[in-house]
Amino acid sequence: MEEERDHNASESSLPSLSKQLESSTLGGSAVDVPVVDLSVSDEDFLVREVVKASEEWGVFQVVNHGIPTELMRQLQMVGTQFFELPDAEKETVAKEEDFEGYKKNYLGGINNWDEHLFHRLSPPSIINYKYWPKNPPQYREVTEEYTKHMKRLTEKILGWLSEGLGLQRETFTQSIGGDTAEYVLRVNFYPPTQDTELVIGAAAHSDMGAIALLIPNEVPGLQAFKDEQWLDLDYIDSAVVVIIGDQLMRMTNGRLKNVLHRAKSDKDKLRISWPVFVAPRADMSVGPLPEFTGDENPPKFETLIYNDYIDQKIRGWALEDLPVY
């Protein structure tokens, strides 16, 4: 228990706001995070590359991933069209008590300066279409097609991670619930701001779930905290950004890295991103798998019901760092 409390403190103890703003390569040269080309026929090579990137960085990009370029274009089109609607129309899918729905965060302070749309994608039993925009009319069709591709890609990556760490291919997929694992989309809309050195589009955080797959538009802004500094990530056109979350880190007893990351707004250009978060069911127990623990490597984390983990992590965040969802 003591180890768990200590590590949870480190998970939720984010760099101070001054550190977040000062220690950054923003405006300088972006760094190249690992890139994995899925068109490579040598699957053993892909397994090694995915594991290495997840252990050393906790974030990487995949190219030639099989998601049609036209579908990605349509996804960006319908998302942009939604945020261009009048506020009154966007408010028809506004948040109520749950995290789902539309929200605008321009409330002063520097964190979470954005608008966003949040809703569940899968499994079908948890989808609430009242939070899916009816305008633009193609939104649902495009998003459902995109979900199919993202699920296939997620399961491929989880399978490679499992195999690369000496597990059965389905281990990580089944450990987060298999077909009942929850997929959630958040469309982030970061408008231009002249106060780029004073405003953070999305505050520094690690993802609470297992893994996230993200597509941004062409405007840079995603940053990762590595080697005691914030690094701007150089995005490759049509790539998918893969981000390792807390639960894969916990299941592997710390072997995989849950990367701390944030989003910055641009001075002149609109930035939009489409992360899909993949997480266990709320009632699932998640903790170190036996393959990663032993007499010389005791569990670093307590096995917790996922919903309890969420509550514990949120309580550990400072109010100013709390994501607004």
From Swiss-Prot:
Catalytic activity annotation: a (2R,3R)-dihydroflavonol + 2-oxoglutarate + O2 = a flavonol + succinate + CO2 + H2O
Biased composition (Polar residues): 10-21
Enzyme Commission code(s) on record: 1.14.20.6
Residue positions binding 2-oxoglutarate: 188-190, 271-273
UniProt cross-references to InterPro entries, sorted A to Z: DIOX_N, IPNS-like_FE2OG_OXY, IPNS-like_sf, Oxoglu/Fe-dep_dioxygenase_dom, Plant_2OG-oxidoreductases
Coiled-coil portions: none
Keyword Iron: yes
Ion transport among keywords: no
Cofactor: binding details: Binds 1 Fe(2+) ion per subunit.
Keywords: Iron, Metal-binding, Oxidoreductase
Region Disordered: start-end pairs: 1-21
Tissue expression profile of the protein: Expressed in young seedlings.
Start and end residues of each Fe2OG dioxygenase domain: 180-280
Cofactor: Fe(2+)
Enzyme class: oxidoreductase
A Gene Ontology molecular function term of the record: metal ion binding
Entry binding sites for Fe cation: 205, 207, 261
Gene ablation phenotype (knockout): No visible phenotype under normal growth conditions.
Pathway of action: Secondary metabolite biosynthesis; flavonoid biosynthesis
Cysteine pairs bridged by disulfides in the record: none
Similarity comment: family membership: Belongs to the iron/ascorbate-dependent oxidoreductase family.
PANTHER family the record matches: OXOGLUTARATE/IRON-DEPENDENT DIOXYGENASE
Protein's name in the database: Probable flavonol synthase 5
Gene behind this protein: FLS5
